[in-house]
Amino acid sequence: MPLLRFDVIEGRDEKSLQLLLDTAHQAMVEAFGVPERDRYQIVHQHPANELIIQDAGLGFQRTKDMVIISMTSKARTESQKEKLYALLAERLEKKCEISPDDLMVSITENGDADWSFGLGEAQFLNGKL
């Protein structure tokens, strides 16, 4: 049930975006053990001047290929998060040719009462999920 938002610089073609989304989803399924159909993704494309991501003094060489993944999720362990970060960096580089320097991930955690998948219900609270 994690909700992933991808912020990228505009200009990627549909095939590249789909590969990015598919690759990130597979990494999340493996790292978090969520069901394959537990997929919620949103892409935001920005003009280059509207996306400023520096390196926090870590020496990253950012390019126009940078991707920011913001995730909202129920609580995950530190080891699950570290596995996700590593899988994303490895697989996005291999499959999408996105350098690990161009990847930033942020996870915000929430609880069962913070989700409604429709019908005005909190499915985690009412036992439907």
From Swiss-Prot:
Domain of life: Bacteria
InterPro entries: Tauto_MSAD, Tautomerase/MIF_sf
Name assigned to this protein: Probable tautomerase YolI
SUPFAM superfamilies for the chain: Tautomerase/MIF (SSF55331)
Entry EC no(s): 5.3.2.-
Family indicated by similarity: Belongs to the 4-oxalocrotonate tautomerase family.
Swiss-Prot/TrEMBL keywords: Isomerase
GO molecular function annotations of the record: isomerase activity
Origin species: Bacillus subtilis (strain 168)
Active-site residues annotated for this sequence: P2
First-level EC class: isomerase
